[in-house]
A protein has these predicted regions:
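Conserved CoA-thioester-binding segment of acyl-CoA-metabolizing enzymes
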Residues: 1-59, 83, 94-97
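Structural preference for beta-strand elements that scaffold enzyme active sites
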Residues: 17-19, 66, 107
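Generic beta-strand/beta-sheet core signal
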Residues: 59-60, 109
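Glycine- (often His-adjacent) and acidic-residue-rich active-site loop
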Residues: 60-95
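Glycine-rich beta-to-alpha active-site loop
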Residues: 93-111
Length: 111
């Protein structure tokens, strides 16, 4: 196992191909909440550190792939104004960019 988190696991399948699996434990759906975002960042770092990975297959352990952001977490940030929203959103944006910037092919397997 390359990374074993509560929302994401990364494991080598074969021939340099790893599975990057979203499966938020304790929830019926995958969503981008704070815990998932932190796990996402750690999983990306684990992939970057593993030179044996030549490609990623992104999968989901749920019947829906990912439903999106956890809007229940928006309220406290929105109540604090524009600066709080930017301060909260930009690091998340950077994490998604770091996934995009991984220098290996990525394929999403959505059924």
């Amino acid at each position: 196992m390359i990374h074993a988190g509560n929302a994401i696991t990364v494991q080598m399948l074969a021939d340099g191909i790893a599975e990057f699996r979203f499966d938020l434990q304790g929830e019926s759906v995958n969503k981008f909440n704070r815990a998932t975002i932190e796990d996402f960042q750690a999983a990306i770092a684990a992939v970057k550190a593993n030179n044996d990975i030549k490609g990623l297959i992104v999968t989901s352990g749920k019947s829906t792939f990912i439903v999106g952001a956890d809007i229940t977490e928006f309220g406290e940030n929105f109540a604090q104004g524009e600066k709080a929203i930017v301060d909260w959103a930009m690091p998340v944006h950077d994490i998604f960019n770091s996934f995009e910037d991984l220098e290996l092919p990525k394929v999403a397997a959505i059924n």
